[in-house]
Curated annotation (Swiss-Prot):
Organism: Emericella nidulans (strain FGSC A4 / ATCC 38163 / CBS 112.46 / NRRL 194 / M139)
Full protein name: Monodictyphenone cluster transcriptional coactivator mdpA
Ranges where the HTH iclR-type domain occurs: 77-147
Cysteine disulfide partners in this protein: none
Compartment list: Nucleus
Function field: Transcriptional coactivator; part of the gene cluster that mediates the biosynthesis of monodictyphenone, a prenyl xanthone derivative. With mdpE, coregulates the production of monodictyphenone.
Length: 479
């Protein structure tokens, strides 16, 4: 009991502190000037405000764990179940697009436009409004809220909902039957997904034939499972390497310029080469299902943050270098980060930069569309492409940024919940799983030559993220 009371006091203190931070960081607006669809914390808010926002949500989660009774728990599950069903219904009939982003509209008009019964629509709107999704400011009128409007302006959110409702939830509910029928099978066509969708084909082969799945799965992965790496930059900033003056850094398999720009601004004396997959070649790990390019983090927006646009512009204007696998473009258009160079490199190709001080290598995470054996093969190939460099350049360091499945209670509960969500999703869709830290280190132990091998010399991690930085050096054998 004393421990629980102590935790309650801690959560209360953290909540108060975070709320004060948001109040101090966010400009005050009167109710008349603030749009109904404008969120309290906008994407342009300071990093401190966004950190405080996450702290509040984390603290609320902790408070719920302390205070929730069995009845509360069941009620919450029932409400979430109905909310998901309502969102699927709204998405199926494209109702959200029928509601103007500003102002109100009669529910009757929306029902006629969407071709649905007005009584059904009214009841569903009133249910979702309890969660802040849509609003009924006056009886019989509907308007978008700050939570619902982005589902119109950013369709990927709706893709994630439809995938959750149409694929993930039905598959999850078939876990008991899958265990009864298939036991501990690892075959990708003997899964809860196969039973739920009554489909004998694997999820990977099915998604190859269905563009909708190709669109929905990455959206769900990014927005439904908190599959972000926004803590990597914070962890990298803890490295002593960046405080050693003028050093050369290569970021391999980057998804945006956010991280490089942040590091370049924090440490102006470093020079960073950002390597992305060549637009002419295959994607890093699955030609049919590339990893989604993540949007810039809040407050870090830049016209080159989306590498799809960047790739298209540089591919047509910059000649290939003498190396068959790369070509380079210097981002002179970025005055605040002029020490950044962009280079296209095919995954697992020989590393063309051999004299850098630091190599930051972003490796892929497991996916239902890529078997673990194939993933491991690509990871080993990428590591081996840097082995010779580390051997010939003893001062060079390789930094890996894996997101392993954490040990129980090793990270904050909501962070662990997201990791367990991804792990169970992989099992239900394809009998795949997240990789544990020991397995990552075991993979590294297989990267060697006749003179030495790669070893982990340091680990950096945080309770706020599942990402672990592995500092790798080449170690010669004792003869």
């Amino acid at each position: 009991m004393m421990s629980s009371l102590s935790d309650l006091e801690t959560h209360a203190s953290e909540l108060t502190s975070a709320v004060k931070t948001i109040i101090s960081q966010c400009p005050r607006q009167n109710a008349a000037s603030r749009s109904r669809t404008q969120p309290l914390i906008t994407s342009s808010a300071s990093k401190e405000a966004h950190r405080a926002q996450q702290s509040i949500l984390s603290t609320i989660s902790g408070l719920q764990k302390l205070l929730t009774s069995p009845t509360d728990f069941l009620h919450h599950l029932a409400v979430q179940n109905q909310l998901l069903a309502c969102l699927q219904w709204l998405g199926e009939f494209q109702v959200l697009a029928c509601i103007p982003l500003t102002g109100t509209v009669p529910i009757k008009d929306v029902a006629e436009l969407a071709g649905v019964p007005e009584t059904h629509l009214s009841r569903i709107i009133r249910m979702t409004a309890t969660a802040g999704f849509l609003d009924e400011p006056d009886p019989g009128q509907v308007a978008h809220s700050a939570l619902s409007a982005p589902f119109v302006t950013k369709p990927s959110y709706l893709d994630a909902v439809m995938f959750l409702a149409g694929t993930i939830a039905p598959s999850a509910l078939q876990m008991p039957t899958a265990t009864q029928r298939f036991g501990a099978s690892l075959r990708p066509n003997e899964t809860a997904y196969n039973l739920a969708l009554n489909n004998p084909a694997t999820f990977a082969s099915t998604s190859e034939q269905r563009p909708k799945l190709q669109r929905q799965w990455p959206a769900f992965l990014q927005y439904g499972t908190s599959d972000t790496d926004d803590r990597v930059t914070d962890l990298l900033s803890r490295l002593d390497h960046f405080r050693r003056g003028s050093i050369s850094v290569v970021e391999v398999s980057a998804r945006s310029l956010d991280r490089a720009t942040t590091l370049a601004n924090l440490y102006p004396s470093i020079n960073i080469t950002v390597q992305i997959a060549s637009p002419a070649g295959p994607t890093a790990w699955s030609p049919a299902h590339p990893n989604p390019i993540r949007p810039p983090t809040p407050g870090g927006s830049h016209k080159h943050d989306d590498l799809r646009a960047l790739t298209a512009s540089t591919a047509s204007t910059t000649p290939a270098s003498s190396h068959n696998h790369t070509h380079t473009h210097t981002t002179n258009s970025i005055p605040q980060a002029s020490n950044i160079t962009i280079q296209h490199r095919l995954p697992t190709a020989p590393q063309p930069i051999t004299s850098a001080n630091l190599y930051i290598l972003h490796l892929p995470s497991p996916s239902p569309t890529v078997p673990f054996a194939s993933l491991a093969t690509h990871i080993l190939a990428e590591l081996r492409s840097h082995l010779d460099i580390l051997r010939s350049n003893p001062s060079a360091t390789l930094i890996l940024t894996p997101r392993p499945l954490p040990e129980p209670s090793a990270v904050h509960s909501e962070v662990e919940a997201s990791a367990r969500l991804r792990d169970l999703t992989l099992m239900q869709l394809a009998n795949e799983r997240e990789i544990e830290l020991a397995e990552w280190i075991n993979l590294l132990s297989n990267v060697s030559d006749s003179m030495g091998r790669l070893v982990v010399v340091n680990k950096i991690q945080s309770r706020e993220s599942t990402v672990v930085l592995l500092e790798i050096r080449y170690q010669a054998y004792n003869r």
